[in-house]
Regions:
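Metal-dependent amide/peptide-bond hydrolase catalytic core
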Residues: 1-3, 13, 20-23, 39-48, ...
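Acidic/His- and Gly-rich active-site-bordering loop/insert found
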Residues: 2-117, 138
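Solvent-exposed alpha-helices and their adjacent loops that cap or buttress functional pockets
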Residues: 80-82, 107, 121, 141-142, ...
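Short coil/turn connectors at secondary-structure junctions
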Residues: 83-87, 103, 110-111, 143-147, ...
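Residue-level marker for buried hydrophobic side chains located in beta-strands
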Residues: 87-89, 177, 206
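Acidic-glycine-rich active-site phosphate/pyrophosphate-binding loop
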Residues: 94-110, 173, 177, 190-202
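Glycine/serine-rich anion-binding loops at beta->alpha junctions
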Residues: 112-127, 209
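Acidic/histidine-rich catalytic neighborhood of metal-dependent amide-processing enzymes
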Residues: 122-194, 243
Length: 290
């Protein structure tokens, strides 16, 4: 019965409408439209719904400066917080496609497949989540548990501005479900994902003339490259390391005094996360001494 009720919901129309709305992670205007569409759709559920301002976030630019980063608002719905059993349902409204990207509108590939920005990842999942919750609310057993829904606007760029909201919503929950598509061809549900950390290392050296006094310089690009190689050596089963980008350099006749190295690490366990953090601190200290 629940499946039939969920199937009767207008999921396809919602996905098409939402996919037509560009909500790239940096498109604040588009995210505001998308959050309003979602708030309107999820207002069909009981409870208290609000759009939450993003937490303050900074990033390191190519000049090694810490600058603020703007993000969209996040949707937060709380239903029956007094119930003894509590669940968390999460998703994201942003996509990887900026407003300038040519991939903007959904289209049918054949009678059964719709292709469009965010259709799978994960506006389709949001429609499924909403349909399931609306179907659940129609049965008498609905009162036996409460739940929170968090739909963030920055998942594709690391969820930094929504992390406090997600962490708070997760406390005291019996289980949590995220409505992204399965990573496996047969549709098997994933029980866990590795953690993910994005690191920016600002390396400051000492400038000098490459012809007159190169021995007085400390080459920041070389130091950053050395750090990149040593970070790469941390890779092991359960811990992936991706050295993603190196910003830096100067005219050919000047020893560069600044470089910014960007790295992503993904540990599968908290123990590997702690080991990686300790190793990173040790490697940074070692390169700084050389």
């Amino acid at each position: 019965v629940l499946t039939e009720r969920a199937a009767a919901e207008p999921m396809l129309g919602q996905v098409i409408l939402w996919s037509q709305t560009n909500s790239g992670s940096e498109n604040l205007a588009g995210l505001e439209v998308m959050s309003a569409l979602l708030a309107d759709a999820f207002s069909a559920l009981p409870g208290e719904l609000r759009l939450v301002e993003p937490a303050s976030v900074t990033r390191v630019d190519a000049e090694g400066r810490e600058v603020g980063v703007a993000h969209g608002r996040h949707l937060h719905l709380v239903v029956r917080p007094e119930a003894p059993l509590q669940l968390l349902l999460t998703g994201h409204m942003d996509t990887v496609y900026p407003a300038s990207h040519p991939f903007q509108l959904p289209r049918w590939l054949d009678d059964g497949r719709l292709n469009g920005p965010g259709v799978a990842d994960m506006k389709g999942g949001l429609a499924v989540m909403l349909a399931a919750l609306k179907a659940h609310e129609q049965q008498s057993a609905a009162l036996t548990f409460g739940y929170e829904v968090v739909i963030n606007s920055d998942e594709e760029v690391g969820s930094a501005s929504s992390a406090p909201l997600i962490a708070a919503a997760a406390r005291g929950k019996t289980a949590a479900l995220t409505y992204e598509p399965s990573a496996l061809p047969d549709g098997t549900l994933a029980g866990a994902r590795p953690g993910s950390g994005n690191f920016s290392f600002t390396v400051r050296g000492r400038s000098a003339h490459a012809g007159r006094n190169p021995e007085d310089g400390r080459n920041a690009v070389i130091a950053a490259a050395l750090l990149a190689l040593r970070l790469e050596e941390l890779r092991r089963p359960g811990l992936s390391v991706n050295v993603a980008r190196l910003d830096g350099g100067s005219p050919n006749n000047v020893v560069p005094d600044l470089a910014v190295l960007r790295v992503n690490l993904r540990p599968r366990t908290p123990e590997l996360e702690q080991q990686a953090s300790q190793a990173i601190a040790s490697l940074v200290e070692g390169v700084a001494r050389e």
